[in-house]
Amino acid sequence: MRVKNAVNAKKKRRKILKAVKGYHGALSRRYRLAKQAYIKAKKHAYVGRKLKKRDFRKLWITRINIAARNEGLKYNELIHGLKLAGVAINRKMLSELAVNDPESFKEYVNIAKQAIGK
């Protein structure tokens, strides 16, 4: 007896075609092309999630560096001074302070300056 798989196959195709609904041209209509486009899109999404972390860290460091240089310290001196002083604050919070609360950021800069003896 032959095993028929029409229901599952149709469900699989429908799932892919539903996922690629807004794609351009044949990529949203033809199953074979749609499947390739879907796989590629998922791959790009995965890579993008990894790159996002990198990009945000770069942005935070740039913001901290600009704010620290306005106070007379380089980025690496600021981070080194904060580590010597035992201050546990991450780059995300430090950049938020630099942008939104410059007075608090200035206090952290002073702590770092005292720790490195500047």
UniProtKB/Swiss-Prot annotation:
Q: Belongs to which family?
A: Belongs to the bacterial ribosomal protein bL20 family.
Q: Where are the transmembrane segments?
A: none
Q: What is the designated name of this protein? A: Large ribosomal subunit protein bL20
Q: Which GO terms describe its biological process?
A: ribosomal large subunit assembly; translation
Keyword Ion transport present in the record's keywords: the answer is no
Q: Which GO terms describe its molecular function?
A: rRNA binding; structural constituent of ribosome
Matching entries from InterPro entries are given as: Ribosomal_bL20 (IPR005813), RIBOSOMAL_L20_CS (IPR049946), Ribosomal_protein_bL20_C (IPR035566)
